[in-house]
């Protein structure tokens, strides 16, 4: 799948409101640019199946090719939601065979303790290069 149109929004959950059905909710994020609302439903990939709670920092990705209502605060359908760990950054990017991000902003160095998993949490046994990767990282050198 091509994720090039996915846009990340990082913020702290201000509120979680149950939706009209059993599998949806509205998550309000407090970001540097103000409040942004996200619809989260059964189609949303929530990494590690984390329970979303008020006060939690998350990165929510939306598809900028999908139509959105022209309202304020902005409202998007969350395609992916990830919760960064302490001092972690998250990046969704296409990486080449040398594990360099397509925008040249990050070069991955896979060590013995690096976990490479599929979206559903299974171990990924192939080389991770030449693919779209959702990367959690904490240390970079420039």
In which residue ranges do the predicted regions lie?
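Short, structured beta-strand/loop micro-motifs enriched in basic residues and often containing a Trp
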Residues: 34-44, 110-119
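Residue-level signal for the start and early helices of compact helical domains
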Residues: 4, 29-31, 43
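Short, flexible, surface-exposed loop segments at domain boundaries
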Residues: 1-26, 47-110, 119-142
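Glycine-centered tight beta-turn/hairpin loop motif at sheet-sheet or coil-to-beta transitions
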Residues: 31-35, 103-105
């Amino acid at each position: 799948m091509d994720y090039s149109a996915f846009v990340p929004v990082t913020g702290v959950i201000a509120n979680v409101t149950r939706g009209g059905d059993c599998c949806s909710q509205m998550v309000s994020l407090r970001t540097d640019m103000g409040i942004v609302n996200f619809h989260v439903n059964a189609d949303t990939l929530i990494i590690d199946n984390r329970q979303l709670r008020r006060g939690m920092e998350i990165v929510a990705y939306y598809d900028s090719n999908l139509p959105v209502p022209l309202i304020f605060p902005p409202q998007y359908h969350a395609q992916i939601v990830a919760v960064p760990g302490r001092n972690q950054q998250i990046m969704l990017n296409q990486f080449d065979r040398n594990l360099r991000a397509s925008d040249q902003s990050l070069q991955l160095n896979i060590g013995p303790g690096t976990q490479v998993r599929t979206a559903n949490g299974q171990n990924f046994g192939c080389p991770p290069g030449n693919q779209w990767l959702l990367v959690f990282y904490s240390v970079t050198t420039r």
